[in-house]
Amino acid sequence: RYPYTGVLGILSAEDHEKVRSAMELVHAWDLKDRDFSAVSDGQRQRILLARAICQEPEVIVLDEPTSFLDIRHKLELLSILKEMVRKQHVAVLMSLHELDLAQKVSDLVICVHGDRIERCGVPEEIFTDEYIRQLYGVTAGSYNASFGCLEMEPARGKPEVFVIAGGGSGIPVFRQLQRQGIPFATGVLQENDVDYQV
């Protein structure tokens, strides 16, 4: 809040309230008396986000904000950011390498390859198997746009197992067989069946 404090850098009651509100928003108020160097990386991420929020910015730029966060805190953080965009009209620019999160949370995606912008568009235009393969140079496996995840390449060779699947019942079996390197076949699946996509 120091940009708002004047020459002497004295925090007013309003400044203290803004800091408290920002820390509560990111679930970091319980860390207020802890030494910053003694908290976990995930807790540091939340504290730094609170620091940015209490400045009341029009734009927040975040570099890998979900790094070091567990699943719960990733979801909380992304929900907080989406709420800020909707309610406070803050523009959030962030770099993410987690394609599944970027696909679900972004309004607009800018893909950077090397030192240049490769492509820009809405998630539905960007997150396709063909484009993700091209962007990352993926030669084995595939990108499943429906699930927002990478799929391992199936084991090659004559199928040793036939999996009777459908309605998602085959996915855990497919993945277990892939992990074990066992070639398999499945059927009969409709193209709109979730098992077909995997």
Name these PLM-found stretches.
Residues G137-Q197:
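ABC ATPase nucleotide-binding domains
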Residues A13-K32:
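Conserved ABC ATPase "signature" region
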Residues E56:
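Conserved catalytic motifs of ABC-family nucleotide-binding domains
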Residues I60-E64:
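Catalytic Walker B motif of ABC-type/P-loop ATPase nucleotide-binding domains
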